[in-house]
Structure formats: structure tokens, C-alpha cells
Amino acid sequence: TSRISGIGIAGIEKKIKKLHKKAFQKNVLILPIGGIYKYRKNGETHQYQGNLIHMLQSAVSSNSYNTYKKYAQGIYDLDIINLRDLLDFKKPKQSIDIKEVESVDELRKRFGSGSMSHGALSAEAHETLAIAMNRIGAASCSGEGGEDSNRFIKKKNGDSSNSKIKQIASARFGVTIEYLNNCDEIEIKISQGAKPGEGGQLPGFKVSSEIARLRHSTPGVTLISPPPHHDIYSIEDLAQLIYDLKQSNPKARVGVKLVASSGVGTIAAGVAKAKADVILISGHSGGTAASPQTSVKYVGVPWEMGLTEANQILTLNGLRHHVTLRTDGGIKTGRDVVIAAMMGAEEFGIGTTSL
């Protein structure tokens, strides 16, 4: 059951009948435009439309805050898509002294570019993101699949392409002790927002010699990540893995990536008791994560629901101060960040937008 109601059984029945009628009506030659997975004019509404992407890119390349504001307004003016689009801010009765606000350098530490692997992007894009995040003091995540050890060494100009966060997924591709030792945080990925409860698959044609080398596998052979971690079937198992990872790199925080879902608060409480330092609540509206089309369209829950539940349950159980709450999944503007912060998030992942 959903905490925000929904269309209900009657609504589902109405939709099915409407589709059935469309399928069998006579003398109709017009096919639906579509645009479910890729933007098409007059098709389904997408938040990232071409003009808005171009506007954001222009704002970044020209360092223009005014252009960014036009982009943010363009996102805000779209049809209501997310739960946060239904919310608005109350004007405070009293302003906050700017001295009480964190400095820009401190604020940047709260941001990251999301978990995207070398295999999902490319070596160039993956390294560029890491360098950019390191330059501003934010964090990039390696994603699943390892990272070239050459990146652990700083470049001659002082830049670092080493991802501050290293991810461990169910298949453990690319995970070595050297990999774990060259990071500030280790992230255990339990699931992904775009396909909760499902595993992953990297098709054979994408497994180049470079990817195979990093993942310690064979070029051209499809790589499967199972839905569960086969050494985690309880909170006690998770606690053991967290303990082991902290022994491998005592200086690193250990985070657990969860997906927004009904009951995620209870899971978050267990994760906090397992001595995790960070809990990430991932929403459904970010990147596709190479998900099946049915999952992209029909699966997942907004981070607004998962984040608020996790924050409340952790607080009620006296565990909130033990962990840092992070969220990601379709964060596009400063407004999204502020709403996430008001719902309990302390750190924020911005993946698609950073690309």
C-alpha cells in the first residue's frame, strides 16, 4: 500500500479498459507518438528536454547564474511530475544570520556525482567527473566494476582522478584491497533506484579488454550481478561486512546504498545498528542504470517517500545522530536540494545533471 494513496483499483481498471478500447477500435490509423523512454515532441513529458539541457550546459560553460536561473525556472514550469513539485516553501518569520550558514567550501563537501561505473560511461567521462569533483572538494563514486590503479596517483598538474567513494556491489567486480585502500568512503550497494530488487547485466559487447581487465573477467563475455549479495542475508551479515571493510581501510567511512521503498525506515534502522556511517536513500527518477524498459517505466518509489520515512524511523529509535543521510535520484535544481535537506538529507548525489 502507498502512503500517498494513488489512483486505486478503480483507476487501474479505467486505464486498462481505455487501452483495450484503443487496441480494438476500427478505422484508426494514428499510432501513439510514444516518447516514453526517449523524448519526442508532443509525446510523454520528460523533465530533461533538449532546450533545458542546452540551457544548463550554457550556464555552466559561461559561468552565468542568470542562465542557470532560467534553466531552474524551466524545470519548475514543467507539468507536475515529482512529489516535490506539489510542495512550496513557507516564508520564515525571521531570517538566519549568514554567519550561521556553512561556507561554500564546506557546502561542496555535501555533494557528489552519484554512482556511475567506468563501464556505464567511458574512461574519459568517468575520469573527468572524478577530477571535477576533487577540484571543488565534492565526491565522485567509482560505481560498480573497479577503477584503474593508475588513477590512485595524482597527476603532474596536481589533479586527482581517483574517486573518493569506492562501491562494492553484489558481484564484487574489480574489488581488491588496493581499491579499498584508496578512498575516503566505501559504499555497499544493496540496490539501485531505477531497478530495486533486480541485479545488473553488462552485455558482452560492452565488455572490452579494458573493462575485463578492471573487472578481472573475460572480454566479450556478459557479466551478471546477482540481485542479492550472497553473503548478506541478514543485518548481522551486513554488520560483518561493514566490520571487515573497516578493517581493510580504518580511515574510510562505510555507507550503504538503499532504495526508497515501503518499509525502508526499518531497514535503515538495522543498517545504523550494523555500524554504517552513511545511509543513501536512492529514488526512482534518476538514471536508468541499464535497467529493463519495464523497470524504467513502472518500478521504484520517489526519494521523498523513502527519505522522510528513514529520517523519522531513525529519529524515533534514537539512531539518527549515528549516521549521515544522503539521497539521490533526479535532483536537478537548488530547489530540489533544499527540499531534500528539509526532509532530512545531509548529503546529495547529482548524477545525470553532472553529466
Mark where each language-model region is.
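Glycine-rich phosphate/ribose-binding loops and adjacent secondary-structure elements
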Residues: 1-22, 150-151, 229-355
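Conserved, well-structured core domains of diverse proteins
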Residues: 1-213
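Amphipathic, alpha-helical segments enriched in basic
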Residues: 61, 96, 101-104, 108, ...
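Conserved alpha/beta-domain cores
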Residues: 120, 131, 142-144, 166-172, ...
